[in-house]
Amino acid sequence: MNSKKYALVTGASSGIGLMYARELASRGYDLVIVSNQENEIKQTAENIEKDFSVKAHPIFMDLTDDMAAEKLLQYCKDNNIEIEVLINNAGVFFFNPIIKTAKKRVDVMLDLHVKTVAHMCQVFGADMAERGHGYILNMSSMSAWMTMPGINVYNSTKSFILNFSRSLWYELKPLGVTVTAICPGAVDTGLYGLSDY
C-alpha cells in the first residue's frame, strides 16, 4: 500500500481544474492530472512539482474514450497509486441553438459530462469503497437548476451530474466514500476557447 495521499483531477491543465490541482498540492497531495492538452498538462505537472514539492503525474488522454476510466485506474495500480480524492472537472461548453450544432459537438458534450463522469465514479468509487474511504467531487453548474436557450445540452448534462451525484452519495456513504456536486456560476476560465472539437 502506498502511504502517500493522491488526488486525481481531470481537466487539470487550465481553469478550475488547474486551481483544484494547485490547492490539493498545497495541502500535500501528490497528483494524477489529466487533460487532452498534451503540452499544457506536462507544463502544469512541472510547475506544481516545483512550486509545492509534490509528485504530479501528467496524463494526456481523451476522456471521451469508452475505456478512459479503466485506463486511468490501471495506470494508478501499475504505479502503486491509491486515489483518495477524485475530481471530475473536465468539460466543454458551447453556446448555440441545438438545430445549428454539429452532431459531433453534441456527442462530445454528452460523452464527457455524462458517460465519463458516470464511468469514473463507477470505477474509482468501487476502488475507494473496497478500501473503505475516499472522496469524489463532480463539477456541475448553476445552469443545472435552470432552462436556457443556446445551452440546452450543457445544462441538461449538468443536471445529470447533480442528480447522479446526489444519488451516488446515498450509495457510497455507507461504504466510507463521500460524494459532492459543485454548482458554480459563470467563471471566466477560457473554456469557450477550448470547446471547438
Named regions from a protein language model:
Residues 121, 157:
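Active-site helix of classical SDR
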Residues 27-43:
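Conserved glycine-rich Rossmann-like NAD(P)H-binding loop of the short-chain dehydrogenase/reductase
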Residues 163, 169-197:
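SDR active-site lid
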